[in-house]
UniProtKB/Swiss-Prot annotation:
This is UDP-3-O-acyl-N-acetylglucosamine deacetylase. PANTHER family: UDP-3-O-ACYL-N-ACETYLGLUCOSAMINE DEACETYLASE 1, MITOCHONDRIAL-RELATED. Keywords: Hydrolase, Lipid A biosynthesis, Lipid biosynthesis, Lipid metabolism, Metal-binding, Zinc. The lineage of its organism: Bacteria, Pseudomonadati, Pseudomonadota, Gammaproteobacteria, Pseudomonadales. The keyword Lipid biosynthesis applies. GO terms for cellular component: membrane. Pathway: Glycolipid biosynthesis; lipid IV(A) biosynthesis; lipid IV(A) from (3R)-3-hydroxytetradecanoyl-[acyl-carrier-protein] and UDP-N-acetyl-alpha-D-glucosamine: step 2/6. The keyword Membrane does not apply. One of its GO terms (biological process) is lipid A biosynthetic process. Coiled coil: none annotated. InterPro entries: Ribosomal_Su5_D2-typ_SF, UDP-acyl_GlcNac_deAcase, UDP-acyl_GlcNac_deAcase_C, UDP-acyl_N-AcGlcN_deAcase_N. Catalyzes the hydrolysis of UDP-3-O-myristoyl-N-acetylglucosamine to form UDP-3-O-myristoylglucosamine and acetate, the committed step in lipid A biosynthesis. Its EC number is 3.5.1.108. It comes from Pseudomonas fluorescens (strain Pf0-1).
Amino acid sequence: MIKQRTLKNIIRATGVGLHSGEKVYLTLKPAPVDTGIVFRRADLDPVVEIPARAANVGETTMSTTLVNGDVKVDTVEHLLSAMAGLGIDNAYVELSASEVPIMDGSAGPFVFLIQSAGLEEQDAAKKFIRILREVTVEDGDKRATFVPFEGFKVSFEIDFDHPVFRDRTQSASVDFSSTSFVKEVSRARTFGFMSDIEYLRKHNLALGGSVENAIVVDADGVLNEDGLRYEDEFVKHKILDAIGDLYLLGNSLIGEFKGFKSGHALNNQLLRKLIEQKDAWEVVTFEDASTAPISYMRPVAAV
């Protein structure tokens, strides 16, 4: 049986919020079967919990924000991408502020944290959502689609009319496994344009952004001294974002996601449309791991 997973140990990290610029303390904790991923604002009294679910998404400007009343948690997508990538079903994410720390702008540091904590299988079957028919949402020329696929595949295309983008591929496709996620996707960093930074900061966004946690592009090229981690790092980061956004379904997916110029808002619209259309999906479990169409890393003890 493919079992649900949580963390073996509690683990902590510190960073800054990309948009708030605030110092944030992050604690990842094990959680019982069928808890899902639950964010906790530990700086509030009483502590406020926000389950990582599509229905709890409030803001989608520049990042995905979860809300519970007037309490929010910003920029959840990179951490959720790491949770999805390593097949973590249940965990508590405690924060000392309203935003998940940006770390280096990718999911890599969160993958390292989770692997350092160790993974533990739980005594319950892991639930997958299998896509049964096509579901699409569009906004102008932007599009996001689910189609049936025996596995989990994420295909994405961006379309930036800029020399840095025109000179390299703007499309990519990843046939998901924990290994392909860690190697091909997890280290892709968020990116932004120098020309946008002044506008963003006027609107209290990207206050913590720098070349330490993002790829910064100006009219001539990439400003980061060390360049890109992957030749297709820009579109790979969009795939990373999508994997995190899609994990707000609350379960791992069996199907293909296709995005064209999609972002956090459209990704969330697609999830909400899918959830409404009950004939477009089913929940499945696997008694025999060898018959499952998705491969996860075996749990290893924390070292």
